[in-house]
Amino acid sequence: MKRLYPYLFFLFLCLSAQAQEFKVYQFPADKVPAIDGNTHDWDCVPADYKITEAALKEDEGKHAQPDTTTLKVSVKVGWCAETQKLYFLYEAYDNYWRFSENSLNTDIFEVVVDGDCSGGPFIDRFHPTAPKDVWQAWFKFHGCHAQNYHIFTPAHGNDWCMLWGPQVWLKQKPYADYAYQYSFKEGEAGKLVLEFYITDRKSTRLNSSHSV
């Protein structure tokens, strides 16, 4: 089956600022993962598709390499052409989970997706013509070239992520779904499993009644 290698920028803590190209597994429509937090649907994905903490980079220059005694991660990504969705399995061990505060200062898994590799800025303040009306830049520009998901690990109450941009429906069904598995409490060590899918914004243009 043909393999897809779109550009996905994974910013777990801080991945290298330089773009990296990762393998994405091709799921047939009848084999897409059930979003239930169970990892068995991912057993078919080859080991060399897995992204680990070895790909992480601490960007403040305090550590030469990740400390696996404090954080270990494993990420697998899949794509289904029929559903036009990206599927993620994120597994992480942390020696201290922080998630009770409703802010981005808690543990998150951050994903930025540029579905057609069009490139260019996607944040309102970097609008190429710098419109005087900041709200026009927000609604008409922010999140167009790429979509930025700040995914809480685990969820903040009923909210599983902060989608940075006005297209908030992209984090809701049928465009996204998620499931967690964990047993730790705030401040404890433990393993978290996060399974979710998201829909590339560009593939929603012909399928959505929302204004994009």
Predicted regions, residues:
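Bacterial Sec-dependent N-terminal signal peptides
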Residues: 1-23
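Structural preference for beta-rich elements and adjacent junctions enriched in aromatics
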Residues: 20-212
